[in-house]
Design a protein with these regions (language model features):
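Ubiquitin-like/PB1-type beta-grasp interaction modules and other compact soluble beta-rich domains
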Residues: 2-13, 19-142
Length: 142
């Protein structure tokens, strides 16, 4: 009888611990992050090159570490469904990053692309991967 009670109490405490652990590790989707695919840092792929891309929107940031065999930052992100866009006269116009849409026509928002803290001089699909570089996509407003 005592063993059954101890086992039941242990099972209940274990369940409570698991629920607390899961709920503490879950970020809440709010604002522009409501449609985000990832709310926490994530790793993708298993290629020879490593590219690290920070995604910043409002006050929140996630970092994606991608191992890829692709040659450009854009191709690595597209390979894992992390960006979407439309081809335009100047190359790929990124409209969605991590599930977050920036619609310039609607609210003058766009995705700015930075390399080592400087606004990129080339589009994301033309920027070759430099494993030592710091890349950032930032939800910006004109």
């Amino acid at each position: 009888m005592k063993t059954t009670i101890k086992s039941t109490i242990l099972a209940i405490l274990s369940l409570v611990f698991i629920v607390c652990l899961v709920s503490c590790n879950t970020a809440e989707k709010t604002g522009v992050w409501e449609n985000a695919t990832y709310l926490n840092d994530a790793e993708f792929g298993n290629g020879a090159k490593t590219v690290v891309v920070e995604v910043k929107a409002e006050e929140e940031t996630v970092t994606f570490t991608i191992k890829t065999d692709k040659d450009t930052v854009g191709a690595a992100l597209i390979e894992h469904g992390l960006i979407e866009g439309e081809e335009g006269q100047y190359g790929l116009y990124v409209k969605v990053v991590n599930g977050i849409r920036a619609d310039y026509d609607l609210d003058k928002r766009y995705w700015a692309f930075y390399v080592d803290g400087e606004y990129a001089m080339k589009g994301i699909e033309l920027t070759e991967i430099d494993e030592g570089a710091k890349y950032r996509l930032e939800y910006a407003k004109e």
